[in-house]
């Protein structure tokens, strides 16, 4: 339905784009990812726009649709780097699961897919797809729809920034201690204060 599609595009955050998105129809695409079922659905949706190839070496661009930064995902990035192919990372995640600095730095573009319509009443139906639909993802990759989401939490880009983030304030990652303490004092006095970004 239209509302669900709108929610999917409005909850997708374009974290990075090194002038690769939107993709072009003449580009050959290799699709890989965490789930073979998701990859199969993505291939079918992307094939409406471009040629999907079965080998990374034959591709102009790689679409990596993953749910975690695990060994398989890191190996995919290494293989793409060896083949000198740009990666568009489509990362299904949320507050507790986000792309790390390695993933972002290894990608030419990053779409952070935060949409999840999992039932919250303790049960779910088998084979019920509850993430961003492959057709909506393909539309965003090819510029038919625009991702317009924003994060409601911070993401540290370096491990040093992550260590410096105290976790209780937004927008304090990487700021100096004096500014961070000032921000904490402002929020303590007025919890609804707008902090500079």
Task: Give each language-model segment a name.
Residues 2-197:
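C-terminal non-catalytic regions of proteins with extracellular/luminal or membrane-system context
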């Amino acid at each position: 339905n239209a509302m669900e599609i709108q929610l999917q595009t409005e909850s997708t955050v374009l974290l990075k784009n090194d002038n690769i998105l939107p993709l072009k129809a003449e580009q050959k695409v290799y699709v890989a990812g965490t789930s073979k079922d998701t990859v199969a659905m993505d291939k079918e949706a992307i094939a409406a726009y471009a040629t999907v190839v079965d080998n990374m070496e034959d591709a102009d661009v790689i679409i990596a649709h993953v749910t975690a930064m695990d060994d398989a995902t890191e190996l995919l990035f290494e293989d793409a780097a060896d083949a000198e192919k740009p990666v568009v990372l489509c990362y299904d995640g949320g507050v507790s699961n986000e792309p790390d600095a390695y993933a972002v730095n290894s990608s030419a573009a990053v779409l952070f897919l935060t949409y999840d319509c999992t039932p919250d009443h303790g049960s779910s139906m088998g084979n019920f797809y509850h993430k961003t639909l492959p057709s909506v993802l393909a539309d965003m990759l090819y510029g038919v729809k625009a991702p317009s989401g924003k994060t409601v939490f911070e993401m540290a880009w370096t491990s040093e920034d992550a260590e410096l983030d105290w976790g209780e304030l937004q927008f304090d990652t990487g700021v100096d201690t004096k500014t961070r303490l000032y921000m904490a004092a402002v929020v303590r006095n007025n919890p609804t204060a707008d902090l500079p970004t």
